[in-house]
Amino acid sequence: MAKIAVTGGSGKAGQVVVRDLIEHGHDVLNIDRLPFTNALIPDTPAAYLPADLTDYGQALEALSGGDVLPGIEIVVHFAAIPSPVHATPDQIFRTNMTSTYAVFSAAARLGVRRVVWASSETTLGLPFNRPPDYAPVDEAHMYPETSYALSKVLGEEAARQISRWSGIPFVGLRFSNVMVRADYDEFPTFWEDPHLRKWNLWGYVDESHVAESVRLALDEDATGTDNFIIAAADTVMRRPSRELMEEVFPGVPVRDSISGNDTLLDIAKARQVLGYDPQFTWRTLF
């Protein structure tokens, strides 16, 4: 078991990860501006340090564990403005880039064993006002269309270079739209109009998949850097995936292997390299 610092552990996905890592026996330090603020993990015994991670000095001190959990071995970096609609483009870019660089640089200086961090599906071309080149989109389909997506693409490059300088492995997880159980109540509102969720090719990722992918990334036999799309194995829609593509993105090539409600965010690399195997589907709830 390891001592793990989770930045942004008070956020929606961060809380899920903190809870899961503790349940699997790790010692976890949540580093965030604010402590936990809702009932996702009311009884989770996570240590906490407040920090402004856009400040390198605060990032360095917090990631050392301070007197709260000294000797941090692994960093899981989730702290960020979480989407293109949560602030102005300039605020998003400045905050996300500055904090990511500070966290990565501090992790390298402290000599941690590994960094696992939240990249994003937005790197792939969301919101797809420009149709995708093909479907399902894979890790090579890089079209950042917002300052948020650009901050993630440049975060991946920062990870690559800081890994090269330090020798520390960096694993980037390009999460789809994260869902916790309460979010599934909204799914029926998507089903009548396929255009409502075309912006991410009808993708989603369940909280259980997020937790699973982080745990797998902790154990990946990796050197250097790598990035993986992390999504559910299906879409948010009842209609078949090919039918959705033909209606909303006519003419876009769809791989022959796609059938039924298969995801259009390619998770083959995560399956092959990480052993990622997302079992949960919202279809069990309706």
Locate predicted features.
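Glycine-rich NAD(P)-binding loop of the Rossmann-fold in SDR/ketoreductase-type enzymes
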Residues: 51-54, 91-99, 142, 146, ...
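N-terminal Rossmann NAD(P)H-binding glycine-rich loop of SDR-like oxidoreductase domains
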Residues: 4-24
